Regions:
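Conserved phosphate- and dinucleotide-binding cores of soluble alpha/beta proteins
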Residues: 2-7, 14, 20-27, 32-34, ...
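Glycine-rich beta-strand-to-loop/alpha-helix junction loops that act as flexible
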Residues: 101-103
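A structural signal for short coil/turn segments at secondary-structure junctions
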Residues: 116-117, 202
Length: 255
């Protein structure tokens, strides 16, 4: 049985409303079309405000990642985050000083750094500082300032002033969107300003973002995408966005 794209879109919206999420692989089988075609459907529906894409599928607006608590965020796309973390670890050397923000992907990165020595971590994330503190050879600096109680990160002028006293060999950021046109973006403006300063205080900037973030533009802009030295992501069908980022000088590595 064949479906018009309009009919398929209607049914996908109904499935999202019923189950809260859909998977690309399951929709591909259901409609007997390629996963590439399903991803294009999801892109259209996301642009219309019906859903948000995540790795391997999409979730309804009532289950947006931005609305999840910290525990839910940590579990979401766990396999993709672990793969990104293992890739990120290859970019880190003993004796590095690393600035990192509050993304849950970076908690996985810290776990992947368990074999490194004499690493200094500067972060505004309580969760990531706690992870880093598990390794005796790591030096951990948790930035002070105002505390976001839901997502456990610090922000504000006190955090920025403290950050500006430090210099890092590398900055690893988790972002909610990256595109050639809109740059690096996050859902919260108080996070974005601090992330911008982390880039300014570091020699090399590494962005770890799964493919659902490619081409995405959310509320708060950090900086131009060209400020990214390395983008670490999982394999994506969004070759158009990948090519645009490469033209800006971003070196892209896929898991």
């Amino acid at each position: 049985m064949s479906f018009s794209s309009e009919k398929r879109h209607e049914e996908i919206i109904e499935l999202i409303q019923l189950n809260g999420k859909v998977k690309v692989s399951e929709l591909s089988q259901k409609y007997n079309i390629s996963e590439v075609s399903i991803r294009k459907d999801l892109e259209v529906l996301e642009a219309q405000g019906h859903l948000t894409r995540i790795h391997g599928g999409a979730v309804g607006m009532n289950k947006l990642y931005v609305n999840m608590d910290l525990t839910e965020r940590f579990k979401t796309n766990a396999a993709a985050k672990r793969a990104l973390a293992e890739l990120a670890a290859k970019f880190i050397d003993d004796n590095d000083t690393i600035m990192m923000n509050a993304g849950t992907t970076l908690a996985y990165v810290l776990r992947a750094l368990r074999g490194k020595k004499n690493i200094s971590i500067v972060t505004n994330s309580v969760q990531n500082a706690t992870e880093a503190a598990l390794f005796p050879s790591f030096n951990v600096i948790l930035l002070g300032g105002e505390l976001d109680s839901k997502y456990q990160f610090t922000y504000g002028q006190d955090a920025i002033r403290q950050l500006e006293n430090y210099h890092a060999t590398k900055c690893i950021l988790s972002v909610d969107g990256i595109s050639a046109e809109s740059g690096l973006t996050l859902y919260y403006s108080n996070e974005a300003e601090l992330a911008r300063r982390m880039i300014e205080c570091s020699d090399v900037t590494i962005v770890a973002a799964d493919s659902s973030k490619l081409g995405k533009n959310v509320f708060a802009r950090i900086t131009d995408a060209s400020k990214t030295d390395f983008l670490l992501t999982n394999r994506s069908d969004n070759s158009y966005e990948i090519e645009k980022l490469r033209k800006l000088g971003v070196k892209i590595h896929e898991t």
